[in-house]
From Swiss-Prot:
Any one of the GO CC terms: protein-containing complex
Region described as Disordered: 1-22, 35-118, 267-356
Expression across tissues: Highly expressed in heart. Detected at lower levels in placenta and pancreas.
Start-end of Basic and acidic residues biased regions: 1-10
Native source organism of the sequence: Homo sapiens
Keywords assigned: Angiogenesis, Cytoplasm, Golgi apparatus, Methylation, Phosphoprotein
Record protein name field: Ras-interacting protein 1
Annotated compartments: Cytoplasm, Perinuclear region; Golgi apparatus, Golgi stack
Subunit structure, as described in the record: Interacts with Ras family members that have been activated by GTP binding. Interacts with HRAS, RAP1A, RAP2, RRAS, RAF1 and RRAS2. Interacts with MYH9 and ARHGAP29.
Pfam families: DIL, RA
Coiled-coil ranges per UniProt: none
Residues recorded with modification Phosphoserine: 188, 280, 292, 326, 328, 331, 419
Role: Required for the proper formation of vascular structures that develop via both vasculogenesis and angiogenesis. Acts as a critical and vascular-specific regulator of GTPase signaling, cell architecture, and adhesion, which is essential for endothelial cell morphogenesis and blood vessel tubulogenesis. Regulates the activity of Rho GTPases in part by recruiting ARHGAP29 and suppressing RhoA signaling and dampening ROCK and MYH9 activities in endothelial cells. May act as effector for Golgi-bound HRAS and other Ras-like proteins. May promote HRAS-mediated transformation.
Gene name of the encoded protein: RASIP1
Lineage: Eukaryota, Metazoa, Chordata, Craniata, Vertebrata
Length: 963
């Protein structure tokens, strides 16, 4: 694995490539990783076999960074030199023009004196023929001092080995110096001016090879791999780290540093020619887990000696490559070979392939050709790159590994306040790509959805994308100014559209005539067809109102102005419907941050219009009249006319608020939770909805204020009027207002006017109930306070008067029951009914009752109110209340300090309606008045757009031709 492809959290490479398995295997980086493997050094991986490594139990010194394994090609051995150890150095070397050779201990032709050789040298043929497996590592706890055989293959042709005593602390530099001394080169003129320079000119190499095949020559050594040991490495420990496979031999060789450098440069040059530069794989030697065979190096150049036949070079190289690979890599090599064969077969079947003269192809060319054969995934959606920013870094296929895929800019940038950078699946390193640029959701259900981030330039099939939209297979997705992708989903099984929507509608030959010149090149529609579509929109009944952000203020102002003026015959909820169309267009078509700004502007316009209307009503109905000018009470008809605009605004604002709440919730769900502007948008929406709440509160308060002000002058008749007048017949339940007793008609007239007003304005049922609840609360408190006040100082609490009040109250409740308000009226008139029922008890029964029984029968009355009614009850001349009516000592304090009057401030709070809005923006507009207003607004927007054009480009709205 490359150092840049770690699975660590700080690097997104491996986890963010989004390539299928086949693509990753065939990528150049994968082969680069294979070429970059090294032999282990003294501080690297310790292996007990050629395929399995285990970490050494002892801490070892780290190797120098230049320690590498190089392939030197086939090194041919020419035979060993004969003679005793005491002979001169000139007798140990013999010139041979056969290239770089080394002896493994067997005497060659023409080398007499083999009987005088050391015993260790006599055993060398057996060692070279096949190295016996070393004892297991478990039996060698600590490396004792030993003798290392250092061959002088790099000194001269035919140089034999020298035995050098080494310990676990002996370094490669020390052993080189000792070996040179044994060879008689230390301090020689050829070696340099001194011993130090002579040692610096040579390096100790760890060589891996095997005897030649049968028939080539018994005991001939052929080096396959070579690694230069660092000066600080311990050769004895290196020897203990691993052993060669059966059939392979390992030995230490003494070579010149210049030769080692040349081999290194040749290896790097071969790697660069295959597209695998050395800087990419050099760091791998310290952390990769290599096989015992090491890394294959470049073959020797034509000028170097080769001990292998030319025809067997490819086979031997393939065997060498297989030696250092695991089973899985060998399987992948077979897969590559099969892919190359299929590619060659495809090329041979191409037209003209039979005539083409194809020479010997470089295997690297076939590898690169195989890498170009990309097979897309079959079970995951992916994006096909059509245009990128940097061809050297961009991939061709980006696979969706999650249901939600995020495109964004790479890097280690953090968010605001030091927060970590947002999670991104695919990094696009273009300057105009945002940290979170675009999000695609492709779940099990189709279609997929694409949502741009705030301020991110995204196009969908060539059109600017501002909101979430559907993404179908074959659609083009543009990110910024550089990236263009095609979305593909193999899971659909070809169920997508037959033709992509971005293709021209007329793919045939260009039709002659002027019609083609006046048509759109992209969609193929002619100018006349486009004009008809525009005319159909301007006059259509679809609930759609399109506008540009620059026209927003004029459009909203026109809708609010028309609603405030009450001009036209719009339906009651027409203004809310038109404003909701504006909100819907902003939520669906315009940018993410536009909706909060529109809601704020809309709420302020409505508030200003309502404030102006309240001020106008206040000027006509002042609270403080000038002295000498009598106050004229409001009639039910007059109050209905005055309150109609306020009631309309209350109804429209209530429905609009419910609609806005739904859209804000949708916006919060759709919005990217990583968007730093999301909180700011939600705050702006909350402020706008708070203004709408305030408008509803004020309109409700003003409406009930003027209604209760009218009721205040009509309610006393319920206590004073006698329903049993001569010739009067009591009406039954559900009677008309004209059939009611005259004393009840003004009060019932106010209730009826309020009921008709709420119905005409289509006020929400919850607000209708709360409006009448407040009216009944006020009526109950006002009548009860008047009843308590009437009993002080005059005989009012009598059975006959109580019967009249009870009858009037029953008639009012029956009429309200017929109007559908019986339950609300019964609940709020309960205390007044309880007080009147107490006064309606016959005198004889009342005298027999005690305080405790009366408290039990009339629980809604407070002790002070009950004591007030009993203490002022008229029992007759000179008769006072009996002692049984006196409260006990435990309630005496409550009677003395309690208030007998009801408080008007304890009214129930206003609760705004919950649930979905009653505005229906689906289906054609059926109301003719609303359709006319919608057409007027569309043409107004058309005129505003035409005013921005030069005079010679302006024209009137198109008119649809009749069929």
């Amino acid at each position: 694995m490359l150092s840049g492809e770690r699975k660590e959290g700080g690097s997104p490479r491996f986890g963010k490539l989004h390539l299928p398995v086949g693509l990753w295997i065939n990528s150049p980086r994968k082969q680069l990783a294979k070429l970059g493997r090294r032999w282990p050094s003294a501080a690297s991986v310790k292996s007990s076999s050629s395929d399995t490594g285990s970490r050494s139990s002892e801490p070892l010194p780290p190797p120098p960074p230049h320690v590498e394994l190089r392939r030197v090609g086939a090194v041919k051995a020419a035979g060993g030199a004969s003679g005793s150890r005491a002979k001169r150095i000139s007798q140990l070397f013999r010139g041979s023009g056969t290239g770089t050779t080394g002896s493994s201990g067997a005497g060659g032709p023409g080398t007499p004196g083999g009987a005088q050789r050391w015993a260790s040298e006599k055993k060398l043929p057996e060692l070279a023929a096949g190295v016996a497996p070393e004892p297991p590592l478990a039996t060698r706890a600590t490396a004792p001092p030993g003798v290392l055989k250092i061959f002088g293959a790099g000194l001269a042709s035919g140089a034999n080995y020298k035995s050098v005593l080494a310990t676990a602390r002996s370094t490669a530099r020390e052993l080189v110096a000792e070996a040179l001394e044994r060879y008689g080169l230390a301090g020689s003129p050829g070696g340099g001016p001194g011993e130090s320079s002579c040692v610096d000119a040579f390096a100790l190499c760890d060589a891996l090879g095997r005897p030649a095949a049968a028939g080539v020559g018994s005991g001939e050594w052929r080096a396959e791999h070579l690694r230069v040991l660092g000066d600080s490495e311990r050769p004895l420990l290196v020897q203990e780290l691993w052993r060669a496979r059966p059939g392979w031999a390992r030995r230490f060789e003494l070579r010149g540093r210049e030769e080692a450098r040349r081999l290194e440069q040749e290896a790097f040059g071969a790697a660069d020619s295959e597209g695998t530069g050395a800087p990419s794989w050099r760091p791998q030697k310290n952390r990769s887990r290599a096989a015992s065979g090491g890394a294959a190096l470049a073959s020797p150049g034509p000028g170097t000696g080769s001990g292998a036949p030319a025809g067997s070079g490819g086979k031997e190289r393939s065997e060498n490559l297989s030696l250092r690979r695991s089973v899985s890599e060998l399987s992948l090599q077979g897969r590559r070979r099969r892919q190359q064969e299929r590619r060659q077969q495809a090329l041979s079947m191409a037209p003209g392939a039979a005539d083409a003269q194809i020479g010997t192809a470089d295997p690297g060319d076939f590898d690169q050709l195989t890498q170009c054969l990309i097979q897309a995934p079959s079970n995951r959606p992916y994006f096909l790159l059509l245009q990128g920013y940097q061809d050297a870094q961009d991939f061709v296929v980006y696979v969706m590994t999650r249901e939600q895929h995020v495109f964004g800019r790479g890097g280690n940038s953090s968010g605001r306040g030091g927060s970590p950078a947002p999670y991104v699946d695919t990094f696009l390193n273009a300057p105009d790509i945002l940290p979170r640029h675009c999000t695609v959701r492709a779940g099990p259900e189709h279609p997929a959805m694409v949502r741009p981030s705030r301020g991110a330039p995204v196009t969908h099939n060539g059109c600017l994308l501002l909101r979430e939209a559907e993404l179908h297979p074959g659609d083009l997705l543009g990110l910024g100014e550089h990236f263009l992708f095609m979305y593909k989903d193999p899971r659909t099984g070809g169920s997508g559209p037959a033709r992509p929507p971005w293709l021209p509608a007329r793919p045939g030959a260009t039709p002659p005539g002027p019609g083609w010149a006046f048509s759109c090149r992209l969609c193929g529609r002619g100018l006349q067809e486009r004009g008809e579509a525009l005319a159909a929109y301007l006059d259509g009944r679809e609930p759609v109102l399109r506008f540009r952000p620059r026209e927003e203020e004029a459009l909203l102002g026109e809708i609010v102005r028309a609603a405030a003026a009450g001009s036209g015959d719009l339906p009651p909820l027409g203004p809310a419907t038109l404003l909701a169309l504006c909100v819907q267009h902003s939520a669906r078509e315009l940018e993410l941050g536009h909706l909060p700004r529109l809601l704020g502007r809309l709420a302020r316009l409505i508030k200003e219009a309502v404030w102006e209307k309240i001020k106008e009503i206040g000027d006509r109905q002042p609270e403080n009249h000038p002295e000498g000018v009598p106050e004229v009470p409001l009639t039910p008809e007059a109050v209905s006319v005055e309150l109609r605009p306020l009631m309309l605004w209350m109804a429209n604002t209530t429905e609009l608020l419910s609609f806005v709440q739904e859209k804000v919730l949708e916006m919060e769900k759709e919005a990217d939770q990583e968007d730093p502007q999301l909180c700011n948008d939600l705050e702006l929406c909350d402020e706008a909805m708070a203004l709408l709440d305030e408008v509803i509160m004020c309109t409700f308060q003003q409406s009930v204020y003027y209604l209760t002000k009218t009721l205040y002058s009509t309610l006393p008749a319920l206590l004073d009027s006698n329903p049993f007048t001569a010739g009067a017949e009591l009406p039954g339940p559900g009677a008309e207002l004209g059939a009611m007793p005259p004393g009840l008609r003004p009060t019932l007239g106010v209730f009826q006017a309020a009921l008709e007003l709420t119905s005409q304005c289509e006020l929400h049922p919850d607000l209708v109930s709360q409006t009448f609840g407040y009216l009944f609360f006020f009526s109950n408190a006002s009548l009860l306070n008047s009843l308590m006040e009437r009993g002080q100082g005059r005989p009012f609490y009598q059975w006959s008067r109580a019967v009249q009040i009870r009858t009037n109250l029953d008639l009012v409740l029956d009429w309200l029951q017929g109007a559908g308000l019986g339950d609300i009226a019964t609940e709020f008139f309960r205390k007044l009914s309880m007080a009147v029922n107490l006064l309606c008890v016959p005198r004889t029964s009342l005298l027999k009752a005690s305080w405790s029984s009366l408290r039990t029968d009339h629980p809604t009355l407070t002790p002070a109110q009950l004591h007030h009614l009993l203490s002022h009850y008229q029992l007759g001349p000179g008769r006072g209340p009996p002692a049984a009516w006196d409260p006990p000592p435990a309630e005496r304090e409550a009677v003395d300090t309690g208030d007998i009057f009801e408080s008007f401030s304890s009214h129930p709070p206003l609760i705004l309606p919950l649930g979905s809005s009653r505005l229906r923006l689906t289906g054609p507009v059926t109301d003719d008045a609303l359709h006319r207003e919608l057409r007027r607004l569309r043409r107004l927007l058309w005129d505003l757009e035409q005013q921005e054009l030069p005079a010679n480009y302006r024209h009137g709205p198109p008119v649809a031709t009749s069929p």
